[in-house]
């Protein structure tokens, strides 16, 4: 009888540790797994830089969320951010225009820049499934992503 209880308890612990994760993806407790990555939403409101720093301290290789296809975005919306209040989270995308070769439609070189450099961070609006460029000093919830 004691062995049965021990085995049953062991199976229950294993089931609970794997719940919310994709089979074969080993994630830390409280994280959800998908396609060899682990994800966790945080309700804290932080600036982009603080959220990225926080993510790097959570788990080896962890950073703010990056999305590579619609299936991954759907997974994040359904499993990690459903409990967040406003459905707007920081993404790991930032400063994408600092290194690009911009040019004017008349062929002239871009030798004068007057855009707001503070707006080089992105948020993911989960209800609409789209990204928006925003001021990096604002505060939002965020999702950390780490290799499994």
UniProtKB/Swiss-Prot annotation:
**A Pfam family name for this chain?**
Lectin_C
Going by the UniProt record, its keywords in alphabetical order are: Disulfide bond, Hemostasis impairing toxin, Secreted, Signal, Toxin
Q: Write out the tissue specificity statement of the associated record.
A: Expressed by the venom gland.
From the Swiss-Prot or TrEMBL record, state where the protein is found.
Secreted
The leader peptide range reads 1-23
- Chain's role: Interferes with one step of hemostasis (modulation of platelet aggregation, or coagulation cascade, for example).
The keyword Nucleus is annotated on this UniProt entry: no
Q: Which PROSITE patterns match?
A: C_TYPE_LECTIN_1, C_TYPE_LECTIN_2
Q: Which GO terms describe its molecular function?
A: toxin activity
Q: Where does the UniProt entry say this protein principally localizes?
A: secreted
Task: Specify the protein name.
Answer: Snaclec 1
